[in-house]
């Protein structure tokens, strides 16, 4: 059996992860990217400025931790954002500290969380801006709530940022003799390849007729910080009278030197947050494509609300399927 050839469309985190995993197993990988390496995780190597909002890597999966540590050193970072509300600043994640801040009261650390207060001041306006429709109170059941004092926004064993940025980490993933990268826009045509991995938006594939909607975000850079002095690098803007949903002091987050603040305003151009009407039908369509040698991967490729660790796990699953198919 000769060396298998793989075509990967997209050099974001999903594409780079798949490329490296398969290259290490002896596959010949051609990866195509129409813009720059990094996708929505792209940052500036010199200043560490993150172009598409704050990215903080976190996971509890030992396999994922071992994988990323092959390509980057990480510095620890614990994400404890601040909510900017009509009642003033409140600490996140949601805990009794949040309620103390909102009510301006001294409360026992074991006091029950006031869900009504959380919904009215943290969730309602933020969610309406983010998703373009009123929030349902049932969303409280899906939120991580600390009964006592709050910890990290992410309840994972590993949390931090690569010291040289995510872009550098992904470039290191592609540094393998079995990987060739071409900066060119292409489609899913697999002529000349044994398998194709698609990490672009799934609704750009030929024949994809399942309904996928996207919420886009406009990213606005500023030198002046309206929230100065800050209590944390990341502020969630939970009030209706400001358009933005989030404001990040990038240097405070990354340790860089861009001197820039990044604001996120919902409903801009781009495909950032997927909304799938029928997940089961979409997954069935993806499974049918796999039988034809076309594998969808990543946040855009599967229209899934993945964090970075989820994306790498998804890449591992896709590569495992391909390797098993080769053995069949």
Predicted regions and their residues:
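N-terminal Rossmann-like FAD-binding beta1-loop-alpha1 element of flavoenzymes
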Residues: 4-31
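Mid-domain catalytic core of redox enzymes
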Residues: 25, 186-285
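Short loop/edge segments at beta-strand edges and connector loops
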Residues: 33, 78, 181-186, 298
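A conserved beta-strand/loop capping segment in the N-terminal third of enzymes
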Residues: 42-50, 57-106, 146-147
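Conserved flavin/dinucleotide-binding core of flavoenzymes
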Residues: 94, 249-328
């Amino acid at each position: 059996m000769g060396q298998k050839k793989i075509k990967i469309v997209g050099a974001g985190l999903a594409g780079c992860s798949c490329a490296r995993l398969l290259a290490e197993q002896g596959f010949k990988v051609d990866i195509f990217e129409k813009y720059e390496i990094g996708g929505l995780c792209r940052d500036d190597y010199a200043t560490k400025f993150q172009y598409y909002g704050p990215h903080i890597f976190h996971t509890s999966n030992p396999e994922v931790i071992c994988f990323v540590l092959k390509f980057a050193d990480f510095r620890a970072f614990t994400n404890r954002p601040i909510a900017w509300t009509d009642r003033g600043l409140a600490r996140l994640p949601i805990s009794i500290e949040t309620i103390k801040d909102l009510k301006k009261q001294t409360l026992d650390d074991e006091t029950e969380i006031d869900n009504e207060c959380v919904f009215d001041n943290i969730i309602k306006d933020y969610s309406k801006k983010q998703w373009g429709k009123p929030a349902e109170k049932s969303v409280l059941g899906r939120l991580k709530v600390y009964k006592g004092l709050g910890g990290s926004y992410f309840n994972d064993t590993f949390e931090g940022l690569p010291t040289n940025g995510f872009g550098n980490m992904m470039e290191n993933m592609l540094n393998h003799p079995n990987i060739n990268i071409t900066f060119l826009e292409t489609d899913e045509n697999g002529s000349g390849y044994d398998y194709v991995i698609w990490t672009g938006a799934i609704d750009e594939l030929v024949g994809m007729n399942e309904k996928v909607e996207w919420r886009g975000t406009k990213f606005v850079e500023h030198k002046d910080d309206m929230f100065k002095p800050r209590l944390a690098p990341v502020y969630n803007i939970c009030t209706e009278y400001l358009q933005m949903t989030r404001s990040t002091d990038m240097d405070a987050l990354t340790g860089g030197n861009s001197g820039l603040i990044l604001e996120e305003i919902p409903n801009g151009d781009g495909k950032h947050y997927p909304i799938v009407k029928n997940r089961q039908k979409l997954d069935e369509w993806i499974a049918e494509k796999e039988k034809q040698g076309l594998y969808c991967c990543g946040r855009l490729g599967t229209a899934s609300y993945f964090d970075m660790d989820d994306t790498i796990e998804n890449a591992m699953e896709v590569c495992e399927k391909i390797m098993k198919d080769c053995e069949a």
